[in-house]
From Swiss-Prot:
Enzyme class, UniProt record, top EC level: hydrolase
Listed EC numbers: 3.6.4.13
Annotated positions binding ATP: A124, K125, T126, G127, T128, G129, K130, T131
Gene label: RH25
Name of this chain's protein: DEAD-box ATP-dependent RNA helicase 25
Catalysed reactions, semicolon-separated: ATP + H2O = ADP + phosphate + H(+)
Residue(s) carrying Phosphoserine: S25
Gene Ontology process terms (BP): response to cold; response to salt stress; response to water deprivation
Keywords assigned by UniProt, alphabetized: ATP-binding, Helicase, Hydrolase, Nucleotide-binding, Phosphoprotein, RNA-binding
Amino acid sequence: MNSDGPKSGKKRREIRAKLVKKLTSDEDGSGKLVKDNNKSLKRGREGKSDVDEPLIKKPASTTPLVTQIAKTSDSYLSKTRFDQFPLSPLTLKGIEDAGFKTMTVVQEATLPLILQGKDILAKAKTGTGKTVAFLLPSIEAVIKAPPASRDNRHPPIIVLVVCPTRELACQAAAEANILLKYHPSIGVQVVIGGTKLPTEQRRLQKSPCQILVATPGRLKDHIDNTSGFATRLMGVKVLVLDEADHLLDMGFRREIERIIAAVPKQRQTFLFSATVSDEVRQICHVALKRDHEFVNCVQEGAGETHQKVSQMYMIASLDRHFSLLYGLLKKHITDNVGYKVIIFCTTAMVTRLVADLLGKLSLNVREIHSRKPQSYRTRVSDEFRKSKSIILVTSDVSARGVDYPDVSLVVQMGLPSDREQYIHRLGRTGRKGKEGEGVLLLAPWEEYFLSSVKDLPITKSSLPPIDHEAVKKVQKGLIQVEMTNKEAAYQAWLGYYKSQKKIARDTTRLVELANEFSRSMGLSIPPAIPVNILGKMGLKNVPGIRVAPGFDKKPAKRNYRSR
């Protein structure tokens, strides 16, 4: 979104960060503050799960109306003011206080259609104001809804927003609270995977809300197990599927279908997505009306990545990856005052390993991944958002939608799961029209991935000469990394690449590559893996695998009589 200037943008980010913190933790990091419709804040426990874990039948296609947004500028901003639309004066006041002046392209394109009562599928690049685009009309729907009677034991939920991850859910709720500054009677709550269900049930009963933001699995839990919740959902007038492509990529088809079945057919539905895959189009036939509109805010020929982000890749053997990363970071830190770097790793445990190593190398590093509790992740996310001269090592929990301002460099270590994930990761930089840089670091046997991004402006970078001093420092740092971290990273690495079909075809070769990764961590012998884990991976009896002692035989029968 546009604003008065840098000061108002900074102020807005600070407000949002505080609200996210309130939504996910209290003073001791163990609770949740939730704005209710009685102007008070209610507390509940936070949870620990990363995202809810898990597709869509191909119905006969229909042809929706298409709205194409043609812009001569690369900017995501438009010249349209918010007060040019019939929005509530109190909402406009909140927008003004937040420093917003003009709309983004996606907001300008979708708002008039939504206000006409249309369902929409909106495609837009990341960081272009999609969240506010669906929140503004959602708030208007709440304002226009008839007030619930005071003796109603199950006051209706008017707006239901479904997000794929807890981070996105909390961020959307924080944005909503900014816009609701002058609407104290409108309550917002968040229900997310991993929290204690009874605590959320008590909070929902004690502090009814009109806007509910949720992750799919937890929402289904409430539909199935929370008294009166299904009745409350029958009041839904607006359903939002945020990051629809990500929801489907994560296998949430059944949950989405269950959610759609639980809300009234007479409703408005908005699907917002950075990419529009066949799966997204299929879910449209289930969720949207036949006359829904497709709003494409990506210019034809503009590409799927931001043009102000330079993209390059390096091909190097695994034994050079850590020292190359260290050299890349040192150069970037030297060249960029106030640098802000995000490093994406293939798994949570590899993330932990890389963060541990960079910490041993005296870099200012933080880590976020699914194995960290939500209170920790919220605190680190907030710190990274507000800080400069900092490095965040993360798994894909930070790949989509999360808004970190002023990220100067994104490094992707190892094979992205697919083209879309590469694009979303890269989208953490170059946001709000700013410049950024992206580097993809691959091993020679991962080079096949480049064919999937050959239409993107990504160029090959030659490898720098070996910096022997840097290599020594990295080797010393790896020695200091905890052995348990190396063992967990090895097992997770093997599991991740076992899921990559082109690599996993030859299991003997896969294990050879895993052992190469083990050596890159400074280990002369690869870690042993329990036989039950190897069985689940389909890697039993593969040459080169070490079975953990004590796990390769069936447990002996216990003689209870001798006790």
